[in-house]
A protein has these predicted regions:
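Flexible, low-complexity linker/loop segments at domain and module junctions
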Residues: 2-26, 101-106, 143-147, 176, ...
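Intrinsically disordered, low-complexity regions enriched in Ser/Pro/Gly/Gln/His and often acidic
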Residues: 3-4, 36, 88, 165
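Short amphipathic alpha-helical motifs in flexible or low-confidence regions
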Residues: 6, 217-219
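Helix-rich "cap/lid" substructures immediately adjacent to catalytic or cofactor-binding pockets
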Residues: 11-109, 185
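Alpha/beta catalytic cores of group-transfer enzymes, especially the acyltransferase/condensing modules
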Residues: 32-34, 60-62, 72, 121-217
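A broad detector of short, well-ordered amphipathic alpha-helices
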Residues: 54-55, 88-92, 115, 128, ...
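Gly/Ala-rich beta-loop-alpha elbow adjacent to hydrolase catalytic centers
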Residues: 110, 114
Length: 219
């Protein structure tokens, strides 16, 4: 698949369709860690986007406009903020590109919390229901994750079997397999620090911008 639109909308993609001529349109909504301070600032000049973001903010009863434009990294790392912010961002940016984009899409999918945006896009439930759901989901997960200091780290490269063995030996959990050559390790902050001190050979480690290890046994 190749990205279309702008690089700031990484969840819009198109590529050759198998079995027939022409392109297919896939909309893939991202999960936590995709948010950055000010990442929605440039979009606010688009009235379609700003109106939709304000509406979704009101539904969720969270100031997503501020969080998407001026809030700092620590604030938007909070799961209770990040999850509704990313769902609203996915919906509002897509509508800004094309108000009818979801009805034209051949494929709708989401990574982690992005599945809620994809569900709303597919019509499985309304955008309002999506925002209420993700607000409650984010709050519940934030509360559960706060009981122990945990986090996640992306492990890129290395031998797959060696990486998984090293993750297990460190007492960590392989929370996500994000594609060939990338596994996300989840666990306590202390476990991840020890893992980073002695990483598997030929790997690069990238701590994720998340409030905790939001998966499996850690919440």
């Amino acid at each position: 698949m190749t990205t279309v639109g702008t690089s700031s909308v990484p969840w819009l993609a198109s590529g050759p369709s198998r079995g027939h001529s022409g392109d297919v349109l896939a909309i893939v909504a991202p999960g936590q860690g995709a948010q950055k301070p000010g990442f929605l600032s440039d979009w606010m000049s688009d009235p379609t986007f700003s109106d939709h973001l304000a509406w979704l903010s009101a539904v969720a009863d969270i100031d997503l406009v501020t969080h998407g434009t001026t809030s700092d990294e620590t604030t938007i790392k909070d799961t209770a903020v990040a999850q509704p912010l990313l769902v609203a961002a996915a919906l509002a940016t897509a509508w800004s590109v094309d108000p009818e984009i979801f009805s034209r899409a051949d494929l709708l999918a989401g990574h982690s919390v992005g599945e809620i945006a994809a569900g709303a896009a597919a019509g499985a439930f309304s955008a309002e229901a999506a925002m209420v759901l993700v607000r409650e989901r984010g709050r519940a997960m934030a509360e559960a994750a706060s009981r122990t200091a945990t986090s996640m780290t992306a492990v890129i490269g290395g031998d797959a079997d060696e990486v998984l063995a090293a993750i297990e030996a460190a007492g960590l959990t392989p929370a996500n397999h994000n594609g060939k050559g990338q596994v996300v390790a989840a666990g306590t902050v202390e476990q991840l620090e020890a893992f980073a001190a002695k990483p598997p050979s030929r790997t690069r480690l990238f701590p994720l911008s998340v409030a905790g290890a939001l998966s499996l046994i850690h919440i």
